[in-house]
Every structure is written in structure tokens, then in C-alpha cells.
């Protein structure tokens, strides 16, 4: 059509990011308003997000073979269809306490406990950003994989991460959020480290599958924890704050991971990212037990029936 300067493309991407995160947060907030178990609902969101991420790259690659702009046209058409479907959803608009960008700060001040899932969300997305860039470079430069092999290894993570989120979300409705979030994060961090120390590509693939399953254990429980804590009239603000911290974590994983890998080593980068997950699990454990949410719901239910 006409040449666009690189700065213009970056500006367009910035606007696209604003629109995307806004629609994404509102879509998840709509699920927060539904009954039937917050873990199940957040697992549904995670299933959709994970499948989209897992299928986006291979489908985009096939469409690119038809032409460089075909993936963009197809994505625009898919987003338009999603927007039309969104008009059919039942909307719930309770009176909100505040609609300003600083509402997140006010919500955190009133409900300090939201900082706990926000912190977990930051570190969880940090690992995702880390694998998106540093993991890809590591697989190709250190393991000698080509683009197809790298895609298979990333798929070993994304497929179980997507498919297990719904059952893991339902599990958190039964056993509570604390066990999946704390124990899951601890095991998840160790699994991330195991990817580097895997002695072969096959073992690396197994480690990536384990990372995906454990990530699916943590992700819906963390989002459900936000839903459990947030007041009914501030769920949108709470989920928006969660996504802000998550996006900052994703960016930190890319920039921080690349910096450590470039200046120190891949081993140091994997250790820092994995131990960050372990650290947040250990440090936040006392805070998790102080939250006003059931630790083990089935035991508390039995005690109420006595």
C-alpha cells in the first residue's frame, strides 16, 4: 500500500497492545462474574488462552506461506468475529467505586491481599517471557535445533499448559487455591531449572511437558484467587491490575533473561528465573495462609456439617 516507518509500526503496536489488554481483561472479568466455581471459570479462560498461543504459531506459519500479509488479514477477521460474539454475552455493570487509571492503586490500598496473586502473576509471566525469547535461543544455539525442532519443544510446553488448565482449575475449586499456588509454584520453578540440566533433547522435551502441566496447575488457581479476594464491584480493576503485573513480568522475562544469558550464561539465566518462582512460593506462603479464602475447602465443609 504505502511505506510505513519503523517508528510508526511501533506506535501502531503500542495502540494495539492497549486495545488487546483492555479487551482481554474485560473478557476474563466476564468469566469472573459467572457462577459454578472461580477455578473452573479461570481454567476455561486459561484453556482458551493456551490453545490460542499453541495454535497461533503453526497456523500463522502456514498462512505466511500464502503471503506475508495473509496472517494479519486472518487475525483481523478472527478478532472481528470475536468482537461480534462478545455482543451476545450477558453484561453485568454494577456501580464501580472508581473508573480512573489510579483505581488499581486504590483497590490495592483497600485490599492489600491482592498483592499476593499479583506477585505470583508477575513471576509466572516472567517465566513465559523468558521461554519466548531466551528459551528459543537456547534450544537453537545450545541444543542445535532448527526452527521446526524448537517449535516442537515449545509445543511440548504449550499443549499441556492449555489442555490441563480446565481440570486444574476445577481441582482448585475442590482443594482450595493455596496448595496449587504455593506447592505448584515451587515445583514449577524447579521444573524450569530442570530444562537446562536435561542431558538430552528428549529429556528436555519431558521437562517442558512437566513445566506445562505445573504451569497449568498454578495459572487458573492464581487468577481464581484474584476473583476470590476482589470485591464484586472491583473485579474488573483487580483483573486489570493482575494483567498489568503479568505484562510487566513477561517484559522482565524477555529483557532480564536476555541480559543475564548474554552477560553471564544460559545456566545463570535459568537459575535466576526458576529460583524466582521458588522464592515467591516460599516468601508468600505465610501471606497465603492469612488470606480470607478456604485453605482446604472439603475439610472446612465437613467441620461445618458437624
Predicted regions and their residues:
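Structural signature of the two symmetry-related core transmembrane helices
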Residues: 1, 179-194
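Helix-loop-helix hairpin linking two adjacent transmembrane segments in secondary transporters
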Residues: 44-88, 267
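C-terminal membrane-cytosol helix-exit motif in multi-pass small-molecule transporters
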Residues: 77-95, 280-288
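A late C-terminal transmembrane helix in Major Facilitator Superfamily
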Residues: 234-264
Amino acid at each position: 500500500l504505502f511505506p510505513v516507518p519503523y517508528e510508526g509500526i511501533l506506535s501502531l503496536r503500542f495502540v494495539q497492545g492497549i486495545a488487546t489488554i483492555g479487551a482481554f481483561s474485560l473478557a476474563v472479568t466476564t468469566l469472573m462474574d459467572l457462577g459454578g466455581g472461580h477455578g473452573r471459570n479461570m481454567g476455561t479462560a486459561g484453556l482458551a488462552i493456551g490453545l490460542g498461543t499453541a495454535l497461533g504459531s503453526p497456523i500463522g506459519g502456514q498462512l505466511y506461506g500464502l503471503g506475508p500479509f495473509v496472517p494479519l488479514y486472518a487475525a483481523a477477521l478472527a478478532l472481528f468475529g470475536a468482537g461480534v460474539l462478545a455482543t451476545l454475552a450477558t453484561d453485568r455493570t454494577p456501580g464501580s467505586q472508581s473508573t480512573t487509571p489510579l483505581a488499581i492503586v486504590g483497590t490495592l490500598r483497600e485490599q492489600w491481599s491482592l498483592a499476593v496473586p499479583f506477585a505470583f502473576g508477575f513471576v509466572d509471566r516472567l517465566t513465559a517471557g523468558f521461554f519466548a525469547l531466551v528459551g528459543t535461543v537456547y534450544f537453537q544455539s545450545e541444543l542445535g535445533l532448527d526452527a521446526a525442532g524448537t517449535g516442537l519443544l515449545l509445543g511440548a510446553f504449550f499443549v499441556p499448559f492449555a489442555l490441563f488448565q480446565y481440570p486444574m482449575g476445577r481441582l482448585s475449586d475442590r482443594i482450595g487455591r493455596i496448595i496449587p499456588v504455593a506447592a505448584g509454584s515451587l515445583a514449577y520453578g524447579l521444573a524450569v531449572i530442570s530444562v537446562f540440566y536435561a542431558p538430552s533433547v528428549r529429556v528436555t522435551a519431558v521437562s517442558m511437558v512437566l513445566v506445562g502441566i505445573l504451569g497449568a496447575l498454578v495459572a487458573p488457581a492464581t487468577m481464581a484467587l484474584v476473583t476470590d479476594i476482589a470485591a464484586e464491584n472491583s473485579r474488573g480493576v483487580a483483573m486489570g491490575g493482575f494483567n498489568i503485573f503479568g505484562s510487566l513480568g513477561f517484559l522482565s522475562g524477555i529483557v532480564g533473561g536476555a541480559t543475564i544469558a548474554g552477560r553471564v550464561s544460559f545456566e545463570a539465566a535459568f537459575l535466576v528465573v526458576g529460583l524466582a518462582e521458588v522464592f515467591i512460593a516460599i516468601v508468600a506462603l505465610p501471606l497465603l495462609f492469612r488470606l480470607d479464602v478456604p485453605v482446604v475447602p472439603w475439610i472446612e465443609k465437613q467441620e461445618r456439617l458437624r
